[in-house]
Amino acid sequence: EGGFAKTLSWLGNNALAYYGPQTLTGTTTTSTGILTGSYTDPATKLTVPFSGAVLQKQGLAGGNFLVNNQAGYLLIEPGTTFGYPGSEAAGPLLRVALPEAAASAPATSVVALTPLAAGSYGGLLTHGGDITGGLESVVISKTGALSGTVVIAGKRYGFKGTLGVDGAATVVIVRTGLPNITGMIQLALADGTTDGYQLTGSFAADGTVHAVDAAFYPIYPKTAPAPQAGQYTLAMRAPDVVDPATQPGGDGYASLKVSVTGDCTGTLTLADGTTATFGGRVSRKAEWTLHRSLYGSTGGYVAGKLTFRDVPSVSDLDGTLRWLKPNAVPATKSYVAGFDTTRGVVGSRYIPPLAGQRAFSTLANRFDNSWLRLSGPDMSTQPALNLLTMDRATTWTSANTLLYYGPDKITLTFTSTTGLLTGTCVDATRGVNLSFGGALLQKQGLVTGRYLAGAQTGLMMMQAR
Protein backbone atom coordinates (compact mmCIF):
# COMPACT_ATOMS: atom_id res chain seq x y z
CA GLU A 1 0.00 0.00 0.00
CA GLY A 2 1.13 3.56 -0.57
CA GLY A 3 0.69 6.72 -2.54
CA PHE A 4 1.73 10.33 -2.85
CA ALA A 5 0.35 13.78 -3.52
CA LYS A 6 2.19 16.24 -5.73
CA THR A 7 1.44 19.80 -6.73
CA LEU A 8 1.71 20.26 -10.48
CA SER A 9 0.77 22.71 -13.21
CA TRP A 10 -1.73 22.03 -15.98
CA LEU A 11 -0.33 24.19 -18.73
CA GLY A 12 -2.16 26.07 -21.45
CA ASN A 13 -1.10 23.45 -23.99
CA ASN A 14 -2.74 20.76 -21.80
CA ALA A 15 0.56 19.22 -20.75
CA LEU A 16 1.36 18.46 -17.11
CA ALA A 17 4.41 20.19 -15.59
CA TYR A 18 6.00 19.21 -12.29
CA TYR A 19 8.94 20.93 -10.57
CA GLY A 20 10.87 18.67 -8.24
CA PRO A 21 13.63 16.07 -7.96
CA GLN A 22 11.30 13.41 -9.33
CA THR A 23 10.13 13.33 -12.94
CA LEU A 24 6.43 13.64 -13.66
CA THR A 25 5.20 14.17 -17.20
CA GLY A 26 1.80 13.95 -18.79
CA THR A 27 -0.10 14.94 -21.89
CA THR A 28 -3.78 15.26 -22.73
CA THR A 29 -5.35 14.42 -26.04
CA THR A 30 -7.70 17.35 -26.45
CA SER A 31 -9.92 15.58 -28.99
CA THR A 32 -10.76 12.77 -26.55
CA GLY A 33 -10.00 14.10 -23.05
CA ILE A 34 -7.70 11.15 -22.35
CA LEU A 35 -4.45 11.81 -20.47
CA THR A 36 -1.36 9.66 -20.13
CA GLY A 37 1.88 10.11 -18.26
CA SER A 38 4.44 8.67 -15.89
CA TYR A 39 6.16 9.38 -12.60
CA THR A 40 9.78 8.40 -11.88
CA ASP A 41 11.58 8.57 -8.54
CA PRO A 42 15.37 8.71 -9.11
CA ALA A 43 16.06 7.58 -5.55
CA THR A 44 14.18 4.27 -5.88
CA LYS A 45 14.41 3.99 -9.69
CA LEU A 46 10.67 3.31 -9.64
CA THR A 47 8.63 4.39 -12.66
CA VAL A 48 4.86 4.50 -12.41
CA PRO A 49 2.80 4.93 -15.61
CA PHE A 50 -0.67 6.40 -15.29
CA SER A 51 -3.65 7.24 -17.45
CA GLY A 52 -7.09 8.71 -17.05
CA ALA A 53 -9.78 10.96 -18.39
CA VAL A 54 -10.85 14.56 -17.91
CA LEU A 55 -14.32 14.85 -16.38
CA GLN A 56 -15.27 18.41 -17.27
CA LYS A 57 -18.64 18.32 -15.52
CA GLN A 58 -16.98 17.37 -12.21
CA GLY A 59 -13.97 19.60 -12.78
CA LEU A 60 -11.33 16.94 -12.25
CA ALA A 61 -9.44 14.12 -13.91
CA GLY A 62 -9.45 10.54 -12.73
CA GLY A 63 -7.87 7.30 -13.73
CA ASN A 64 -5.41 4.69 -12.55
CA PHE A 65 -1.75 3.82 -12.28
CA LEU A 66 0.03 0.51 -12.54
CA VAL A 67 2.99 -0.65 -10.46
CA ASN A 68 4.27 -4.17 -9.79
CA ASN A 69 1.24 -5.61 -11.56
CA GLN A 70 -1.07 -3.78 -9.17
CA ALA A 71 -3.37 -0.88 -9.98
CA GLY A 72 -4.15 2.21 -7.96
CA TYR A 73 -6.32 5.30 -8.17
CA LEU A 74 -5.31 8.53 -9.93
CA LEU A 75 -6.95 11.86 -9.10
CA ILE A 76 -6.04 15.29 -10.45
CA GLU A 77 -8.06 18.10 -8.91
CA PRO A 78 -7.88 21.85 -9.50
CA GLY A 79 -6.68 24.40 -6.99
CA THR A 80 -4.33 27.30 -6.38
CA THR A 81 -3.64 26.83 -2.66
CA PHE A 82 -1.84 23.50 -2.69
CA GLY A 83 1.47 23.56 -0.87
CA TYR A 84 4.83 22.80 -2.39
CA PRO A 85 8.45 23.24 -1.24
CA GLY A 86 8.94 26.97 -0.93
CA SER A 87 5.26 27.93 -0.88
CA GLU A 88 5.42 28.62 2.84
CA ALA A 89 6.70 31.89 4.27
CA ALA A 90 10.48 31.88 4.55
CA GLY A 91 10.41 33.70 7.87
CA PRO A 92 12.73 36.51 8.97
CA LEU A 93 15.51 37.42 6.57
CA LEU A 94 18.72 36.52 8.36
CA ARG A 95 21.62 38.95 8.20
CA VAL A 96 25.29 38.56 8.95
CA ALA A 97 25.96 39.31 12.61
CA LEU A 98 28.69 41.75 13.63
CA PRO A 99 30.57 41.69 16.97
CA GLU A 100 28.92 43.77 19.66
CA ALA A 101 32.14 45.70 20.26
CA ALA A 102 35.12 46.58 18.10
CA ALA A 103 38.53 45.13 18.88
CA SER A 104 40.71 47.30 21.11
CA ALA A 105 43.71 48.97 19.50
CA PRO A 106 47.02 47.74 20.93
CA ALA A 107 48.76 50.04 23.37
CA THR A 108 52.14 51.27 22.13
CA SER A 109 55.18 53.04 23.50
CA VAL A 110 57.62 55.29 21.66
CA VAL A 111 61.02 53.62 21.20
CA ALA A 112 64.46 54.62 19.95
CA LEU A 113 65.84 53.39 16.67
CA THR A 114 67.02 49.78 16.77
CA PRO A 115 68.24 47.45 14.01
CA LEU A 116 65.50 45.05 15.11
CA ALA A 117 62.94 47.45 13.61
CA ALA A 118 64.38 47.03 10.12
CA GLY A 119 61.92 45.60 7.61
CA SER A 120 58.67 46.29 5.81
CA TYR A 121 55.62 48.19 7.10
CA GLY A 122 52.15 49.01 5.87
CA GLY A 123 49.16 50.86 7.23
CA LEU A 124 46.61 53.64 7.04
CA LEU A 125 46.07 57.37 7.40
CA THR A 126 43.09 58.64 9.38
CA HIS A 127 41.45 61.98 10.11
CA GLY A 128 38.61 62.49 12.53
CA GLY A 129 38.09 58.75 12.81
CA ASP A 130 37.76 58.30 9.03
CA ILE A 131 40.29 56.47 6.90
CA THR A 132 41.76 58.98 4.47
CA GLY A 133 44.71 57.21 2.89
CA GLY A 134 47.34 54.54 3.15
CA LEU A 135 51.00 53.80 3.67
CA GLU A 136 52.41 51.25 1.26
CA SER A 137 55.77 49.58 0.66
CA VAL A 138 57.37 51.32 3.62
CA VAL A 139 60.88 50.03 4.33
CA ILE A 140 63.21 50.87 7.20
CA SER A 141 66.86 49.83 7.03
CA LYS A 142 69.01 48.84 10.00
CA THR A 143 70.59 52.30 9.88
CA GLY A 144 67.22 54.08 9.89
CA ALA A 145 66.88 54.89 6.19
CA LEU A 146 63.18 55.27 5.48
CA SER A 147 61.25 55.06 2.19
CA GLY A 148 57.75 54.31 1.03
CA THR A 149 54.57 55.55 -0.59
CA VAL A 150 51.81 57.58 1.02
CA VAL A 151 48.36 57.73 -0.57
CA ILE A 152 46.29 60.84 0.20
CA ALA A 153 42.97 61.65 -1.50
CA GLY A 154 43.71 59.00 -4.09
CA LYS A 155 47.09 60.49 -5.02
CA ARG A 156 50.30 58.54 -4.51
CA TYR A 157 53.49 60.21 -3.29
CA GLY A 158 56.86 58.59 -2.77
CA PHE A 159 58.93 59.74 0.19
CA LYS A 160 62.33 59.20 1.75
CA GLY A 161 63.86 60.13 5.07
CA THR A 162 65.99 58.95 7.95
CA LEU A 163 64.96 57.94 11.44
CA GLY A 164 67.14 59.53 14.09
CA VAL A 165 68.46 57.75 17.15
CA ASP A 166 65.20 58.69 18.88
CA GLY A 167 63.20 56.81 16.22
CA ALA A 168 61.73 60.00 14.75
CA ALA A 169 61.88 61.32 11.19
CA THR A 170 60.59 64.31 9.27
CA VAL A 171 59.92 63.86 5.57
CA VAL A 172 58.98 66.54 3.06
CA ILE A 173 57.21 65.75 -0.20
CA VAL A 174 57.65 68.52 -2.77
CA ARG A 175 54.73 69.00 -5.19
CA THR A 176 54.86 71.19 -8.28
CA GLY A 177 52.40 74.05 -7.99
CA LEU A 178 51.03 72.78 -4.68
CA PRO A 179 52.11 73.16 -1.05
CA ASN A 180 54.57 70.61 0.28
CA ILE A 181 53.36 67.61 2.28
CA THR A 182 55.13 67.22 5.61
CA GLY A 183 55.33 63.93 7.44
CA MET A 184 56.30 63.41 11.07
CA ILE A 185 57.00 59.73 11.69
CA GLN A 186 57.80 58.06 15.00
CA LEU A 187 58.86 54.49 15.72
CA ALA A 188 56.86 52.72 18.44
CA LEU A 189 56.48 49.21 19.87
CA ALA A 190 53.25 47.43 20.77
CA ASP A 191 53.23 46.69 24.48
CA GLY A 192 53.99 43.09 25.37
CA THR A 193 55.84 42.32 22.14
CA THR A 194 59.48 42.10 21.11
CA ASP A 195 58.98 42.84 17.40
CA GLY A 196 55.52 44.40 17.18
CA TYR A 197 56.90 47.65 15.83
CA GLN A 198 54.54 50.42 14.77
CA LEU A 199 54.80 53.74 12.97
CA THR A 200 52.86 56.64 14.44
CA GLY A 201 52.85 60.35 13.66
CA SER A 202 51.14 62.31 10.91
CA PHE A 203 51.17 63.68 7.37
CA ALA A 204 49.97 67.26 6.85
CA ALA A 205 48.57 67.97 3.39
CA ASP A 206 46.40 70.82 2.11
CA GLY A 207 45.36 71.94 5.56
CA THR A 208 44.46 68.48 6.84
CA VAL A 209 46.51 66.46 9.31
CA HIS A 210 46.31 62.71 8.73
CA ALA A 211 47.33 60.42 11.59
CA VAL A 212 49.69 57.53 10.80
CA ASP A 213 48.81 53.98 11.83
CA ALA A 214 51.22 51.45 10.34
CA ALA A 215 52.58 48.12 11.53
CA PHE A 216 55.74 46.08 11.00
CA TYR A 217 55.40 42.96 8.87
CA PRO A 218 56.89 40.32 11.19
CA ILE A 219 58.87 37.33 10.03
CA TYR A 220 57.12 34.05 10.83
CA PRO A 221 59.58 31.13 10.57
CA LYS A 222 58.42 27.65 9.58
CA THR A 223 58.95 26.49 13.14
CA ALA A 224 56.57 29.18 14.41
CA PRO A 225 54.04 29.88 11.63
CA ALA A 226 51.48 32.66 11.81
CA PRO A 227 48.68 31.46 14.11
CA GLN A 228 46.16 33.00 11.71
CA ALA A 229 47.27 30.80 8.80
CA GLY A 230 44.41 29.19 6.92
CA GLN A 231 41.46 29.89 4.67
CA TYR A 232 38.66 32.36 5.40
CA THR A 233 35.52 33.74 3.84
CA LEU A 234 34.54 37.36 4.47
CA ALA A 235 31.40 39.48 4.29
CA MET A 236 31.32 43.27 4.02
CA ARG A 237 27.91 43.97 5.51
CA ALA A 238 25.54 46.57 4.11
CA PRO A 239 23.57 48.61 6.67
CA ASP A 240 20.16 47.28 7.68
CA VAL A 241 18.58 50.32 6.04
CA VAL A 242 20.20 51.34 2.77
CA ASP A 243 18.73 53.06 -0.27
CA PRO A 244 19.97 50.97 -3.23
CA ALA A 245 19.34 53.94 -5.50
CA THR A 246 22.08 55.99 -3.82
CA GLN A 247 24.60 53.37 -2.69
CA PRO A 248 25.04 49.64 -3.26
CA GLY A 249 22.73 47.30 -1.41
CA GLY A 250 23.81 43.78 -0.53
CA ASP A 251 26.98 42.49 1.07
CA GLY A 252 30.45 42.41 -0.41
CA TYR A 253 32.22 39.08 -0.07
CA ALA A 254 35.67 37.55 -0.34
CA SER A 255 37.86 34.51 -0.07
CA LEU A 256 41.04 35.06 1.93
CA LYS A 257 44.11 32.91 2.44
CA VAL A 258 46.66 33.61 5.15
CA SER A 259 49.94 31.80 4.55
CA VAL A 260 52.16 30.34 7.24
CA THR A 261 54.29 33.47 6.82
CA GLY A 262 51.27 35.68 7.59
CA ASP A 263 50.83 37.01 4.06
CA CYS A 264 47.23 37.74 3.02
CA THR A 265 45.99 36.96 -0.49
CA GLY A 266 42.57 36.76 -2.08
CA THR A 267 39.95 38.82 -3.86
CA LEU A 268 37.20 41.04 -2.49
CA THR A 269 34.04 41.51 -4.54
CA LEU A 270 32.34 44.71 -3.47
CA ALA A 271 28.57 45.10 -3.52
CA ASP A 272 28.65 46.98 -6.84
CA GLY A 273 30.67 44.18 -8.45
CA THR A 274 34.04 45.96 -8.32
CA THR A 275 36.88 43.66 -7.30
CA ALA A 276 40.04 44.33 -5.30
CA THR A 277 42.92 42.02 -4.52
CA PHE A 278 44.28 41.51 -1.03
CA GLY A 279 47.84 42.08 0.14
CA GLY A 280 49.83 42.80 3.26
CA ARG A 281 50.67 40.71 6.29
CA VAL A 282 49.19 40.04 9.70
CA SER A 283 50.93 42.06 12.41
CA ARG A 284 52.26 40.67 15.67
CA LYS A 285 49.08 41.99 17.33
CA ALA A 286 46.90 40.05 14.85
CA GLU A 287 45.93 43.16 12.88
CA TRP A 288 45.73 43.37 9.10
CA THR A 289 45.40 46.65 7.22
CA LEU A 290 44.09 46.93 3.69
CA HIS A 291 44.26 49.88 1.29
CA ARG A 292 43.36 49.42 -2.35
CA SER A 293 42.77 52.09 -4.98
CA LEU A 294 39.58 51.65 -7.03
CA TYR A 295 38.04 53.00 -10.23
CA GLY A 296 41.31 53.81 -11.97
CA SER A 297 42.95 57.09 -11.01
CA THR A 298 39.73 58.76 -9.82
CA GLY A 299 40.64 58.68 -6.12
CA GLY A 300 38.30 55.86 -5.15
CA TYR A 301 39.48 53.30 -2.62
CA VAL A 302 38.56 50.64 -0.10
CA ALA A 303 40.59 50.68 3.10
CA GLY A 304 40.46 49.63 6.71
CA LYS A 305 41.78 47.43 9.47
CA LEU A 306 40.69 43.92 10.42
CA THR A 307 41.62 42.10 13.62
CA PHE A 308 41.96 38.34 13.86
CA ARG A 309 40.16 37.20 17.01
CA ASP A 310 37.60 34.58 17.99
CA VAL A 311 34.11 35.98 18.57
CA PRO A 312 32.06 32.84 19.36
CA SER A 313 29.39 32.01 16.77
CA VAL A 314 30.17 35.26 14.93
CA SER A 315 33.63 35.59 13.42
CA ASP A 316 37.34 34.84 13.39
CA LEU A 317 38.28 38.31 12.15
CA ASP A 318 36.39 41.58 12.08
CA GLY A 319 36.70 45.31 11.54
CA THR A 320 35.49 48.00 9.14
CA LEU A 321 36.30 49.11 5.61
CA ARG A 322 35.70 52.56 4.17
CA TRP A 323 34.56 52.39 0.55
CA LEU A 324 34.70 55.58 -1.52
CA LYS A 325 33.56 56.02 -5.11
CA PRO A 326 33.92 59.55 -6.53
CA ASN A 327 31.31 61.25 -8.67
CA ALA A 328 31.26 60.62 -12.43
CA VAL A 329 33.76 57.76 -12.66
CA PRO A 330 34.37 57.24 -16.41
CA ALA A 331 32.76 54.22 -18.09
CA THR A 332 30.73 53.38 -15.00
CA LYS A 333 27.10 52.25 -15.35
CA SER A 334 26.04 52.03 -11.72
CA TYR A 335 26.07 54.62 -8.95
CA VAL A 336 27.48 57.31 -11.21
CA ALA A 337 26.90 59.97 -8.52
CA GLY A 338 29.38 58.16 -6.28
CA PHE A 339 29.11 57.36 -2.59
CA ASP A 340 31.11 57.20 0.62
CA THR A 341 30.24 54.40 3.04
CA THR A 342 31.94 52.59 5.92
CA ARG A 343 30.80 49.03 6.47
CA GLY A 344 31.42 46.33 9.02
CA VAL A 345 33.37 43.25 7.98
CA VAL A 346 33.37 39.77 9.48
CA GLY A 347 35.33 36.72 8.45
CA SER A 348 34.99 33.04 9.23
CA ARG A 349 37.57 30.31 8.97
CA TYR A 350 36.65 28.15 6.02
CA ILE A 351 37.22 24.40 6.06
CA PRO A 352 36.84 22.85 2.59
CA PRO A 353 34.59 19.79 2.78
CA LEU A 354 35.76 16.24 2.32
CA ALA A 355 34.19 14.08 -0.39
CA GLY A 356 30.54 13.49 0.45
CA GLN A 357 30.56 16.21 3.11
CA ARG A 358 28.30 19.26 2.82
CA ALA A 359 30.24 22.52 3.24
CA PHE A 360 27.07 24.13 4.65
CA SER A 361 27.02 21.60 7.48
CA THR A 362 23.94 22.87 9.33
CA LEU A 363 21.58 22.01 6.46
CA ALA A 364 19.34 18.96 6.72
CA ASN A 365 20.19 15.92 4.61
CA ARG A 366 17.15 16.15 2.33
CA PHE A 367 15.76 17.84 -0.74
CA ASP A 368 14.80 21.53 -0.53
CA ASN A 369 16.95 22.06 2.57
CA SER A 370 17.83 25.71 1.97
CA TRP A 371 16.39 29.08 1.03
CA LEU A 372 17.78 31.36 -1.66
CA ARG A 373 16.60 34.86 -0.74
CA LEU A 374 16.90 38.12 -2.64
CA SER A 375 15.87 41.50 -1.24
CA GLY A 376 16.47 45.02 -2.50
CA PRO A 377 15.88 46.97 -5.70
CA ASP A 378 13.24 45.93 -8.24
CA MET A 379 14.33 42.70 -9.93
CA SER A 380 11.91 43.01 -12.84
CA THR A 381 11.97 45.17 -15.94
CA GLN A 382 8.18 45.35 -15.63
CA PRO A 383 7.61 48.31 -13.26
CA ALA A 384 4.09 47.22 -12.37
CA LEU A 385 5.42 44.10 -10.64
CA ASN A 386 7.63 46.03 -8.18
CA LEU A 387 9.47 42.78 -7.41
CA LEU A 388 11.53 43.67 -4.33
CA THR A 389 11.85 40.23 -2.69
CA MET A 390 12.19 36.67 -3.92
CA ASP A 391 12.41 33.46 -1.88
CA ARG A 392 13.11 30.08 -3.50
CA ALA A 393 13.54 26.64 -1.94
CA THR A 394 16.81 25.07 -3.09
CA THR A 395 18.70 21.85 -2.50
CA TRP A 396 22.31 21.84 -1.30
CA THR A 397 23.54 18.28 -1.78
CA SER A 398 26.27 16.42 0.07
CA ALA A 399 28.30 16.66 -3.16
CA ASN A 400 28.02 20.48 -2.84
CA THR A 401 26.01 20.84 -6.00
CA LEU A 402 23.07 23.23 -5.70
CA LEU A 403 19.75 22.42 -7.32
CA TYR A 404 16.56 24.34 -7.93
CA TYR A 405 13.27 22.92 -9.21
CA GLY A 406 10.89 25.55 -10.50
CA PRO A 407 9.47 27.28 -13.56
CA ASP A 408 12.05 30.07 -13.47
CA LYS A 409 15.64 29.25 -14.37
CA ILE A 410 18.01 29.50 -11.43
CA THR A 411 21.58 28.26 -11.62
CA LEU A 412 23.80 28.00 -8.56
CA THR A 413 27.49 27.10 -8.52
CA PHE A 414 29.42 26.59 -5.30
CA THR A 415 33.22 26.36 -5.33
CA SER A 416 34.07 24.10 -2.42
CA THR A 417 37.77 25.01 -2.45
CA THR A 418 37.07 28.68 -1.69
CA GLY A 419 33.59 28.83 -0.14
CA LEU A 420 32.27 31.22 -2.80
CA LEU A 421 28.97 30.94 -4.68
CA THR A 422 27.75 32.43 -7.95
CA GLY A 423 24.48 32.17 -9.80
CA THR A 424 21.85 33.56 -12.12
CA CYS A 425 18.07 33.88 -12.07
CA VAL A 426 16.06 34.23 -15.27
CA ASP A 427 12.27 34.50 -15.46
CA ALA A 428 11.42 35.82 -18.91
CA THR A 429 7.69 36.07 -18.23
CA ARG A 430 8.31 38.50 -15.37
CA GLY A 431 11.26 40.34 -16.88
CA VAL A 432 13.82 38.99 -14.42
CA ASN A 433 17.46 38.50 -15.42
CA LEU A 434 19.81 38.63 -12.44
CA SER A 435 23.33 37.60 -11.54
CA PHE A 436 24.48 37.17 -7.96
CA GLY A 437 27.34 35.95 -5.81
CA GLY A 438 28.26 35.45 -2.19
CA ALA A 439 30.33 33.61 0.40
CA LEU A 440 29.54 30.86 2.89
CA LEU A 441 30.32 31.90 6.46
CA GLN A 442 30.56 28.54 8.18
CA LYS A 443 30.76 30.05 11.65
CA GLN A 444 27.38 31.78 11.22
CA GLY A 445 25.81 29.09 9.06
CA LEU A 446 24.68 31.24 6.15
CA VAL A 447 25.63 32.53 2.72
CA THR A 448 25.57 36.25 2.09
CA GLY A 449 26.32 38.42 -0.93
CA ARG A 450 24.77 40.65 -3.55
CA TYR A 451 22.70 40.58 -6.71
CA LEU A 452 22.73 42.93 -9.67
CA ALA A 453 19.45 44.20 -11.14
CA GLY A 454 20.02 46.73 -13.90
CA ALA A 455 22.26 49.43 -12.41
CA GLN A 456 21.44 48.71 -8.76
CA THR A 457 22.38 45.97 -6.32
CA GLY A 458 20.63 44.22 -3.46
CA LEU A 459 21.08 41.51 -0.85
CA MET A 460 21.46 37.84 -1.73
CA MET A 461 21.62 35.26 1.02
CA MET A 462 21.03 31.58 1.69
CA GLN A 463 19.84 30.11 4.96
CA ALA A 464 18.62 26.78 6.28
CA ARG A 465 15.07 25.69 5.46
Task: Show where each model-derived region lies.
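Mature soluble binding/inhibitory domains
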Residues: 1-465
